[in-house]
């Protein structure tokens, strides 16, 4: 017989770490450790924008966030992913749509740490960069056009490599 619902939820929560461990083990067997990883997030809308205020699906986990590429608000979740240079997803996490990308980096790094990380402008933070430097992680984000100190790190090569995760998302 099946366990009751609360017991089933506890079993699933306890199994999550074990399943992550198995997933990383399989990835390590079938692909080399990546030289660098790319971090990005994507919106996961649960309803059409017109229904944002009335939606009752997953109210404990979802809320209203802003999709900058479409320039519109959406009700749903946000998925944050860390993909290797070969396109495999090494770490992932889901959060409320309103949670800022910077706050998800630590969750991703708990699952898989890489010495070199590329990210987009949504992860631009001096605090985060300094914190990761202390931990021995090189964290690259392109600088914005209006920034006073434009860094030399804005190379076309790194920007081209960062586009790779967008291709993974579109599959």
Task: Give a label for each model feature.
Residues 1-171:
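Short alpha-helical elements
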């Amino acid at each position: 017989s099946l366990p009751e619902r609360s017991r089933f939820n506890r079993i699933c929560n306890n199994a999550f770490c074990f399943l992550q461990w198995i997933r990383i083990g399989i990835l390590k067997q079938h692909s080399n450790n990546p030289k660098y990883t790319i971090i990005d997030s994507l919106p996961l809308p649960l309803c059409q924008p017109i229904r944002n205020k009335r939606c009752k699906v997953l109210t404990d986990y979802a809320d209203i966030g802003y999709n900058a590429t479409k320039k519109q608000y959406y009700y749903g979740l946000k998925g944050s992913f860390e993909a290797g240079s070969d396109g495999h997803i090494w770490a992932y996490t889901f959060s409320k749509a309103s949670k800022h990308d910077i706050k998800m980096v630590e969750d991703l790094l708990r699952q898989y740490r890489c010495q070199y990380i590329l990210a987009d402008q949504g992860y631009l933070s001096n605090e985060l960069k300094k914190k990761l430097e202390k931990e021995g992680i090189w964290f690259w984000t392109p600088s914005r056009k209006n920034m006073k100190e434009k860094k030399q790190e804005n190379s076309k090569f790194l920007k081209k490599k960062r586009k790779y995760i967008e291709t993974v998302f579109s599959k």
